[in-house]
């Protein structure tokens, strides 16, 4: 065991460290933390997975504009096809980091619907921004809002299909909550499927789903 836990620091230094805890470590503590190590990056090259959505911009542009170089690392962006693929590559080590859904991180950390592995959220890339979309076919029949959708489903009963991008993602949670608020059971009254974000519009166009 090192002396890190037993080293006595002035009260003023400890209070300063607490004040900046959200953004970094005070110099006195940093010196102790790195007494046995180095400030050099653990890896010179880091592979970061992303799905082509607007909130991946921070990752992609950091590489394009060379922001990574001043920190002594090289970012290798890796375009992925689905959130499930990103999850699997994070778990097996093919990716070092990834642009992911908050719910995906917690799902992996808790071992929900797959292998359990410790995860950490290092940066927030967006704050919500999701939207719920209904097909033009439904809109043409008056389903331009939730009440209209509920009325149409009662008037024309059939299997209605809605898509979300990942079972533990906020998209799924918002969709389920939205449907349930109108008395529509998202697990019994409609069919819910998983579709990767880049494939949503194409699936809507060919009629594979009624909304997402």
Which residues does each predicted region cover?
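N-terminal secretory signal peptides
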Residues: 1-13, 22
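Short amphipathic alpha-helical segments with coiled-coil-like heptad repeat character
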Residues: 1, 23, 74-78
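N-terminal export signals
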Residues: 13-33
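Loop-centered beta-sheet repeat module
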Residues: 200-212
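Short, glycine-/small- and polar/acidic-enriched structural segments
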Residues: 36-187, 191-195, 210-211
């Amino acid at each position: 065991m090192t002396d890190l836990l037993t080293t006595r620091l002035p009260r003023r230094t400890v209070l300063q460290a607490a004040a900046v805890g959200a953004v970094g470590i005070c110099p006195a503590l940093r010196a102790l933390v790195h007494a046995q190590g180095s400030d050099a990056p653990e890896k010179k090259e880091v592979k970061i997975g992303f799905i082509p959505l607007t909130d991946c911009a921070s990752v992609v542009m950091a590489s394009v504009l060379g922001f990574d170089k001043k920190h002594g690392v090289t970012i290798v962006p890796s375009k992925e096809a689905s959130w499930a693929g990103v999850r699997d590559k994070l778990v097996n080590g093919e990716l070092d980091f990834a642009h992911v859904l908050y719910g995906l991180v917690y799902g992996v950390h808790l071992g929900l619907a797959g292998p359990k592995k410790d995860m950490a959220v290092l940066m927030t890339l967006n704050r919500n921004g999701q939207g719920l979309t209904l097909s033009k076919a439904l809109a043409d029949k008056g389903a331009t809002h939730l009440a209209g959708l509920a009325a149409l489903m009662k008037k024309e009963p059939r299997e209605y299909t809605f898509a979300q991008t990942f079972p533990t993602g906020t998209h799924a949670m918002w969709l389920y909550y939205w449907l349930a608020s109108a008395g529509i059971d998202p697990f019994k009254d409609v069919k819910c499927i998983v579709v990767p974000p880049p494939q949503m519009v194409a699936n809507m166009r060919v009629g594979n789903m009624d909304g997402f």
